[in-house]
Amino acid sequence: EGITYMKSRAVAGDLERATRFLNRVQDVDWRRWGQSGRSRPQLAQMRLRLEKEQGAADPLTAGRGGYYDIDFALMFLRLKGAGIFFPVLNTPARIDVIEQMGHLDRSDADFLRDAATFYRAVDHGLRVSTGHAEGSLPTSDAQLETLAALVRRWTPDHLHNQPLDIELAPIQARTREFFNRLFGL
């Protein structure tokens, strides 16, 4: 519920008035969910349920250490600071704002930006190369090389120094370590 309210955006009419209203909604959201910490166990449960139900079929997104670990962590951190209205929703911008608020230290923020960039590049590369969303890396060497070439276009050099499967494993492990630390698991 709190997360849904935070995703609201002014799109028509008096944008200034709508933005003031959304600021007030997020202040209420913060008092109800962020300040009390009530969202922490609920978000952890939701995330682990998604992993159990979808993780095997979609390990890059829903699996252990997948993109959802980042997304749910950012949702929790955003709820902690929900009194501040976020004019943008993209992941790198959310990480930047949460870091500036003091809810992420520099090394965690840098890692989350890299991990999110890597996951999104792999996801987009899979969509471009196969024509649809895939939940895991391809098993064919030719498809894996095509995907790797696409990922190299969209990521900084340090995120594609090794084959994708070798690059992925430590990102997943560190993503889950961050998630567990944040949620006290």
Where do the language-model regions lie?
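A nucleotide- and high-energy phosphate-metabolite-utilizing enzyme signature
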Residues: 1-185
